[in-house]
Curated annotation (Swiss-Prot):
Organism placement in taxonomy: Eukaryota, Metazoa, Chordata, Craniata, Vertebrata
Family (UniProt): Belongs to the bombinin family.
GO cellular component: extracellular region
Asparagine amide found at: 70
Name of the protein this chain belongs to: Bombinins BLP-7/H-BO
UniProt cross-references to InterPro entries, sorted A to Z: Bombinin
Domain of life according to the entry: Eukaryota
Positions of modified residues (Leucine amide): 140
GO biological process: defense response to bacterium; defense response to fungus; killing of cells of another organism
């Protein structure tokens, strides 16, 4: 008689443990799904902010280019204008990476291509901010 109770209790404990393990696995998978959704939302927000920043920089660069295009320019202003035009081309290539030069992307895997565009963004943003600062300083000063 005691043997039957021992088997019944052992079976009850084993089934309870199996249910708890199954529940733990389900909660972990649900947590993973929520974490993944959060990461997607964060990436979406980051992409939107980056896109807005690029658009703002392009608009400001176009405005400065138009300002320098109208009227007489000094040699320094001419150089700034050339740099702004180069920046505009680079910003356009960032907006349309699939249309970027095939020479840059031929033979690279996807990760190398992503790194190439990230480096290009960093290379562009620094000089753009410097050019904008100089141009605004020239306009205000």
């Amino acid at each position: 008689m005691n043997f039957k109770y021992i088997i019944a209790v052992s079976f009850l404990i084993a089934s309870t443990y199996a249910r708890s393990v199954k529940n733990d696995e389900q909660s972990l998978s649900q947590r993973d799904v929520l974490d993944e959704e959060s990461l997607r939302e964060i990436r979406g927000i980051g992409g939107a902010l980056l896109s807005a920043g690029k658009s703002a920089l392009k608009g400001l660069a176009k405005g400065l280019a138009e300002h320098f295009a109208n009227g007489k320019r000094t040699a320094e202003e001419h150089e700034v204008m050339k740099r702004l035009e180069a920046v505009m081309r680079d910003l356009d290539s960032l907006d349309h990476p699939e249309e970027a030069s095939e020479k840059e992307t031929r033979g690279f895997n996807q990760e190398e291509i992503a790194n190439l565009f990230t480096k290009k963004e960093k290379r562009i943003i620094g000089p753009v901010l410097g050019l904008i600062g100089k141009a605004l300083g020239g306009l205000l000063g």
